[in-house]
Amino acid sequence: MSDVLERVSKIVIEHLDVEAEKVTDKASFIDDLGADSLDNVELVMAFEEEFDIEIPDDAAEHIQTVGDAVKFISEKVG
């Protein structure tokens, strides 16, 4: 498992209180993991803090799945 995926998964598990098995690349934060819009905002903020990056609002709107988050963060941190 990549470092980014591992760290994103840990944040998702902690913030959404879901089982690790449910956190997959294709898992939608809202549809599969039970997040609401406030949870999404909190996740984005947690990703920003964990990876010391800024995720613009327009980009945050497109981060709908675990895989989306991993891809965006991987591109930002190199």
UniProtKB/Swiss-Prot annotation:
Belongs to the acyl carrier protein (ACP) family. GO terms for molecular function: acyl binding; acyl carrier activity. Residues 2-77 form the Carrier domain. It comes from Maricaulis maris (strain MCS10). Pathway: Lipid metabolism; fatty acid biosynthesis. This is Acyl carrier protein. GO terms for biological process: lipid A biosynthetic process. SUPFAM superfamilies: ACP-like. The modification O-(pantetheine 4'-phosphoryl)serine is found at residue 37.
